[in-house]
């Protein structure tokens, strides 16, 4: 008799993390593992139609197969545009007057 693959399904919020271990049939997909875990019922705020998922930090489509020991991750949408976040960090560094921040300013204003 073959053993059913065991996978973990995780979803993380800033204040709470969920990690559920489930047994899935051989040949199961990411979608099957998520459905078997019940994570979508635990977190009704997850938009199932726009689900971004991965396996061990690498993006994976919902129909990707899972293997024994995989960790299926459900990703949240970005809150801030990465370019905007970086620009805010640069502006803050410049305001604080660090050498790192000042090197991008014109020479006459350093």
Curated annotation (Swiss-Prot):
Residues 90-110 are annotated as: Disordered. Belongs to the UPF0125 (RnfH) family. NCBIfam families: PRK01777.1 (NF002490). This is Protein RnfH. It comes from Burkholderia mallei (strain NCTC 10229). The gene is rnfH.
């Amino acid at each position: 008799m073959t053993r059913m693959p065991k996978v973990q399904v995780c979803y993380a919020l800033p204040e709470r993390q969920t990690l559920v271990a489930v047994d899935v049939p051989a040949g199961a997909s990411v979608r099957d593992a998520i459905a078997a875990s019940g994570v979508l019922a635990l977190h009704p705020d997850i938009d199932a139609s726009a689900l971004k998922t991965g396996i061990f930090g690498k993006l994976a489509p919902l129909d990707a197969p899972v293997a024994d020991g995989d960790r299926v991750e459900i990703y949240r949408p970005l809150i801030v545009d990465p370019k905007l976040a970086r620009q805010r960090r640069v502006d803050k560094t410049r305001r604080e007057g660090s050498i790192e921040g000042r090197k991008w300013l014109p020479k006459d204003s350093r």
